[in-house]
Amino acid sequence: MIQKRVESGIISLVIVFLLMFLAIVLKYYNITEDKKDIPAAYQRSVVEITADVGQGTIYDRNMIPLVNTEKYQYAAIVPSAVDKNEIMRYAADKADFSDNYESGEPFVFKCTDVPPESEGVTVFEIPERYNGYQLAQHIVGYISDGTGVSGLEYAYDKVLRGNSGENKVTYYADGFGRVLIGDGKTVQRSSVYESGIVTTLDSRIQKICEKYGSSIDKGAIVCADVETGDILALASFPGYSYNEIDAALEDERSPLINRALYSYGVGSIFKLVTACEGISEGNDGYLYSCTGETEIDGQQFRCHKYDGHGLQDMMQAMTESCNTYFISLSRSFDIVKYRDLAASLGFGRENFLCSGITGSAGVLPTVDELAVPAELANFSFGQGKLTATPLQITQLACTIAGD
């Protein structure tokens, strides 16, 4: 009897100890689980609302911006902290605002007017990268998804993006990412737009070139400083819309091409080079009687004045742009020196402006090719195989006019 009571007591004691151990285990489990829940419910994190990642500005020579020229107001809001109808009246696109507001997530919208700032509303003044009409677009180029694709935007992409700065507002949030209104906010406003790169372009001259060149179906205008050679304006036609890049890619007129950097037949302006070589070889007093045509190895070459210009010196022949005069003048030239002069004036050589913007070398006939009399005759007044870019021709004009 006593033994049974002892055994029963031992069993009861074991059960008590087991229950106590189980209670301790459960308590530990609850404590550890509670600790896991604490970050999710109470631990603070941050939520950033970025209105814009700015990029440096491209300026003309007078520090007039070619991009970032117009500024607009944008507002970053926390839907849970603002009245929808009160703020929506400031939105440029109310339908888009409504959709974003209903999502409950913080967002940024463009404003038609400046809303009052509050804990849940932060206003930023942000420049538009490109406006409706972009000046010097073939030099400026364009960006896609924040990265430079062509022009200076491509060439100096790292510089312009390296100068980037964010316009953003930062809030504290709970572990679920919900903004904690009332805990304050941190606002960062970027001044990066004032930094960037400076070009040699003069926006005033560029505007004039683009205005009067807009009627050109296909072509280019280049304007340079005679003394320094600085490019003051460079315009290519036709232009394109930044909002319709895909359409421009499909356009048979190829508006994305910078025609100032593509090579074409040169024509009579090359007579300047022929005249320079004539002077260099001591033939500045050369006289020739133009009859309207001349024959070289059985091939007829005509002057634009079919009945001829008569007897002319170099100045008169240049004034009249007489083809046969320069054909005759060139026949006495040292061909190697003649070609070398053309090369020294930029023909047959690429124009490297910056990474991604390089003018074509064009075609400068070889000495062997110019040894053929008919080829030399064509070369003397800018015909035949010779090609050059509008930029190369501008350089030629600057070299001569500068002297």
Name each region found by the language model.
Residues 65-67, 225-268, 273-403:
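Beta-lactam-recognizing serine transpeptidase/beta-lactamase-like catalytic domain environment
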